[in-house]
UniProtKB/Swiss-Prot annotation:
Substrate binds at H63, L64, R65, N95, N279, H310. PROSITE patterns: DIHYDROOROTASE_1, DIHYDROOROTASE_2. Zn(2+) 1 binds at H61, H63, D153, D306. Catalyzes the reversible cyclization of carbamoyl aspartate to dihydroorotate. This is Dihydroorotase. The gene is pyrC. It comes from the Bacteria. GO terms for biological process: 'de novo' UMP biosynthetic process; purine nucleobase catabolic process. One of its GO terms (molecular function) is zinc ion binding.
C-alpha cells in the first residue's frame, strides 16, 4: 500500500530537517521527502496541514506483562496502547513469568508481537538467569534470538563483581546493559521518597542516596570496563550530576527519565494515592527542576515511560501494600509536549529524545525518515485537547496518576511499516 502524507511540519533530527514537506511511502518504506511530491494513482493521502510529522516514536522501557501476567496487560493490549500514544516501537522488559532469560521466551514475544501486535516489539533480555542476580544469562543467545538489550529491571544487580562481568560480556556481544540503579539495602521497606511529605504522611521513605549510590557504582564500573551503559528512569539531581560528570570524562553512559519525573513531585502521594506509587519514587521539586535542566543540557538522552500496568486489585490497597508502577504509554507524548510549551525543549530536541536517541541506544534501524528507511511515522496534532479518562485508555490497566487531567497534544496517526495502525 502506498501513502502520501501532505503538508505537515516534518521534524527529523537524524537529517536535520524541520520544514513543511510531503512524504511518500511505498511498500512499507519511505520513498521520497520533498515539496509537491507526486504520488502514483490510488495512493492513500493524509492531509497533515497544521500537524507535526516525525520518525515513529520509540518507548525503550515498557512492561507488557506477557507471558505470565496477562491479566494486567498483554502484547495485544499493550501495543494498542502504544499505538494510541504515538509509539511505533517499544522495548519490553524481561520481568515476565517466566523471566525472559532464554531463546524460547524471546521467540514467543517476537512471534506473538508479529502476529497480533499493533507496533514493533523489541525484547529486552535479563542480565542474570531468572533475574536472581546470581548467574549471568546467555547474552549471546539472547542477542541472536532478537533481544536488543539486557536488564534486570526491577531487580537491580547487587553483586558488583557480577555487574562488572555483565558489562564486559555485553560489550563483547555488542548488546546494551540497562541498569535499574537502586541500592536495595537503602531502599529497605521504603514506599515513597524520603523527606518532608513521607514524614508528614507517616510512610517509610526511600532516600535519594539509594539511587545516587547505585548510579555511581554502575558508572564507575562502566568507566573501568570501558563498556556502554544505560541508566533507566533517572529521578534525582544527584544521579544526574554523576551522569553529567561521567559524560564529561568520556564514559559511555546514556540515560532516560520518565514523564512522571518531570510532571509530578512527591506531593502527589498526599491522600495516599497508590497511582502515585512507583519505583524509583516521585521526588522533590528540586529534583524535578534538575530533571528538566538535564533534559535541556543533553545529560538525559531519552524519555521512556516505564509503562507498568497493574490490576486494580493490586493498586486498590493500603499504600504500603500496593504494587509499584503506573501506565504511561498513552500520556507520555502529551506530557512531554508540555516541555516544549514551557521552553525546556524545542520540538526537534524532543523528537530526538523520543525517537532518534532510543533507536541509537538500542541499535535498531528506526528513528529516521531517510529515503529507504522503514516507514514508521508518527503524526502529531499539537493542538488536540483531551481529558485522560480511564474508560478510554487502550491499556488493560488504568493505574495512572494523570486521570482527570486536561491535556493538549496527541497522536493523530500512528504508522508502522507504512500501515496506519492508529487514527485519532
Amino acid at each position: 500500500m502506498n501513502l502520501l502524507i501532505q503538508g505537515g511540519r516534518v521534524i527529523d533530527p537524524s537529517q536535520g530537517i524541520d520544514e513543511v514537506l510531503d512524504i511518500l511511502v511505498e511498500n512499507g518504506a519511505v520513498k521520497e521527502l520533498g515539496k509537491g511530491v507526486k504520488a502514483p494513482s490510488g495512493t492513500e493521502t493524509i492531509d497533515a496541514s497544521g500537524l507535526i510529522v516525525t520518525p515513529g516514536l520509540i518507548d525503550m522501557h515498557v512492561h507488557l506483562r506477557d507471558p505470565g501476567h496477562e491479566y494486567k496487560e498483554d502484547i495485544v493490549s499493550g501495543t494498542k496502547a502504544a499505538a494510541a500514544g504515538g509509539f511505533t516501537s517499544v522495548a519490553c522488559m524481561p520481568n515476565t513469568k517466566p523471566v525472559n532469560d532464554n531463546k524460547a521466551v524471546t521467540s514467543y514475544i517476537i512471534a506473538k508481537a508479529k502476529a497480533e501486535g499493533s507496533v514493533n516489539v523489541f525484547p529486552v533480555g535479563s542480565i542474570t538467569q531468572g533475574s536472581k542476580g546470581e548467574l549471568l544469562s546467555e547474552m549471546g543467545e539472547l542477542k541472536e534470538s532478537g533481544c536488543v538489550a539486557v536488564s534486570d529491571d526491577g531487580h537491580p544487580v547487587t553483586n558488583s563483581e557480577l555487574m562488572r562481568r555483565a558489562l564486559e560480556y555485553a560489550k563483547g556481544m555488542g548488546i546494551m546493559v540497562i541498569s535499574h540503579a537502586e541500592d536495595l539495602s537503602l531502599v529497605g521497606a521504603g514506599v515513597m521518597n524520603e523527606g518532608f511529605v513521607s514524614t508528614e504522611l507517616g510512610l517509610k521513605g526511600i532516600p535519594w542516596a539509594a539511587e545516587d549510590a547505585a548510579t555511581a557504582r554502575d558508572v564507575y564500573l562502566a568507566e573501568f570496563t570501558d563498556s556502554p551503559l544505560h541508566i533507566a528512569h533517572v529521578s534525582t539531581k544527584g544521579s544526574l550530576r554523576i551522569i553529567r560528570n561521567a559524560k564529561a570524562r568520556g564514559v559511555k553512559v546514556t540515560c532516560e527519565t520518565a514523564p512522571h519525573y518531570f510532571s509530578l513531585t512527591d506531593d502527589a502521594v498526599r491522600g495516599y494515592d497508590t497511582n502515585a506509587k512507583m519505583n524509583p519514587p516521585l521526588r522533590t521539586a528540586d529534583d524535578v527542576t534538575a530533571v528538566k535542566e538535564a533534559l535541556k543540557d543533553g545529560t538525559i538522552d531519552a524519555i521512556a515511560t516505564d509503562h507498568a500496568p497493574h490490576h486494580i486489585d493490586e493498586k486498590d490497597l493500603e499504600f504500603n501494600e500496593a504494587l509499584n508502577g503506573i501506565v504511561g504509554l498513552e500520556t507520555s507524548l502529551t506530557l512531554s509536549l508540555r516541555l516544549v510549551e514551557e521552553g525546556v525543549l524545542t520540538l526537534p530536541v524532543l523528537v530526538d529524545k523520543m525517537a532518534c536517541n532510543p533507536a541509537k541506544i538500542l541499535g535498531i534501524d528506526r528513528g529516521t525518515l531517510k529515503p529507504g528507511s522503514v516507514a514508521d511515522i508518527t503524526v502529531i496534532d499539537p493542538k488536540a485537547t483531551w481529558t485522560v479518562d480511564a474508560d478510554k485508555l487502550a491499556s488493560k490497566s488504568k493505574n495512572s496518576p494523570f486521570l482527570g487531567w486536561e491535556v493538549k497534544g496527541a497522536a493523530a496517526f500512528t504508522i508502522v511499516g507504512g500501515k496506519v495502525v492508529y487514527k485519532r
